[in-house]
Amino acid sequence: MKKIIIFFLMILSSTIFSEEYKPYLKKNTNNKNLVFSAQIKDSKKVISIYKENKKLIYVYGSEGEKAEKIIIGTTNKNLFKNENEIPLNENNNNKLTENFILFKVKNYTYLISFYNNYGVKENSYTLTVAKNDEEILFDKELDISTVYDNLFNTNLFKKLPYDNGVVAYYVTYD
């Protein structure tokens, strides 16, 4: 009987958890925990990232539907960042910045990239999924008009630990 109750509670808690975190664009939700959302260009799929205590939750799927992928990111375990600055001139007074946030699950890496081009050209965001840190399975641009970003230029991002793994899937302008 005790096992049945525990099993029932586990199902109930996972159902409640999956109901709470669905892929949404910012304009369509009032969830205060949403820190990033965007729609994949030429697709109906949406990426949402929620902040829950010290964790970031990556959610992928059709907007408002049950998530196809949920990853609970914990710093120093499976949640990391990387960044790069590229000087635009010899004086190094103008730079492009590239910011990357990584969610790692087993041998897969889910990478969201933000390229801040400071008006030189339009800023851009991409989603890349890699297997074994080298084989790129998915690499799509995010629709800039749908992006809600309260993540990349915040203390939350700055406090994330750096990724020390292989960086073959980072696309940089160097």
Give the location of each predicted region.
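Short, low-complexity, Pro/Ser/Thr/Gly-rich segments in the mature regions of secreted, periplasmic
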Residues: 159-174
